[in-house]
Amino acid sequence: MCSSVAAKLWFLTDRRIREDYPQKEILRALKAKCCEEELDFRAVVMDELVLTVEQGNLGLRINGELITAYPQVVVVRVPTPWVQSDSDITVLRHLEKMGCRLMNRPQAILNCVNKFWTFQELAGHGVPLPDTFSYGGHENFAKMIDEAEVLEFPMVVKNTRGHRGKAVFLARDKHHLADLSHLIRHEAPYLFQKYVKESHGRDVRVIVVGGRVVGTMLRCSTDGRMQSNCSLGGVGMMCSLSEQGKQLAIQVSNILGMDVCGIDLLMKDDGSFCVCEANANVGFIAFDKACNLDVAGIIADYAASLLPSGRLTRRMSLLSVVSTASETSEPELGPQANTAVDNMSASSSSVDSDPETTERELLTKLPGGLFNMNQLLANEIKLLVE
């Protein structure tokens, strides 16, 4: 048994995802950290909590147990694509109102739940963003076909609540958009975004913890699709990132109010970057492997540092040093690495009524010529990481 002192740290997650790699690793790291620091620790599942207002005061019960000593810091992992403001966010607001320090805070999570909400928060801060349109309501996709034409074709079409690269399409023309409007699911609105051609099938994932860049990973598609997500078969390797890229990721994290986040950057021909997405519930199984890091351990260290008596550990304080040192040995991202693939073209084929099961057929493919930059890059990454 670990000794207990006044400081309390909780790990709050959702039953639907608690057995996934990131949650299991964070739980392991938090337990180890709390034993090392002799901190009182508890892991809690969202649906175990009962929120109360009694005699004008906020209260909390867990499986019938009245909680009298509240946590000072709560590490939160909730499935952001399905976050419900009337349930999940209500719990997080309740804990925050009781004086708990949440990482991430509920407003920060909401900033990343909807991709267009993310852009709304980032707009006006000088953050480079691809031009993006969206709409109110659920049935206005077809109406947007003409409105979004100024973005030019091909254009990117995304579900505002999509995740892991799903429900993302590259529409070649207005007719393709019209076809999509009849096939996609309309539970959430879609956004229409200017296509960054030179970053097709490639992006940079940056993980930021406590306002510091933990590491950076170049992700590359292996089959010509636009998305480079490792969950869709993409591969990744540790890479260096320019100071401009690092500062951009930190700026995005700060604007969104994030303690832990993953920022996806698209690469431009001139070596600069623009923001693609921000992830409040960032996965890191491929990131850990590619960058030889223990992201969960870094998260646990930062959580402990937020306690009243906490301080940044050596692992956290050395992050920037490690990041700088890696640039001497890892491939650099710059204008040469960002050379555009000029001969991309869109294609379509007959599809079933469910786009998520036939997404592959709707995606733009790179032509099967003798020279396919992304395929070569992906093969090199595989050789380096295997």
Swiss-Prot record:
PROSITE patterns: ATP_GRASP. It is found in: Cytoplasm. Its cofactor is Mg(2+); Mn(2+). Keywords: ATP-binding, Cytoplasm, Ligase, Magnesium, Manganese, Metal-binding, Nucleotide-binding. GO terms for cellular component: cytoplasm. Transmembrane segments: none annotated. Residues 119-304 form the ATP-grasp domain. Residues 327-359 are annotated as: Disordered. It holds the Pfam family RimK. N-acetyl-L-aspartyl-L-glutamate (NAAG) is the most abundant dipeptide present in vertebrate central nervous system (CNS). Beta-citryl-L-glutamate, a structural analog of NAAG, is present in testis and immature brain. This is Beta-citrylglutamate synthase B. It comes from Bos taurus.
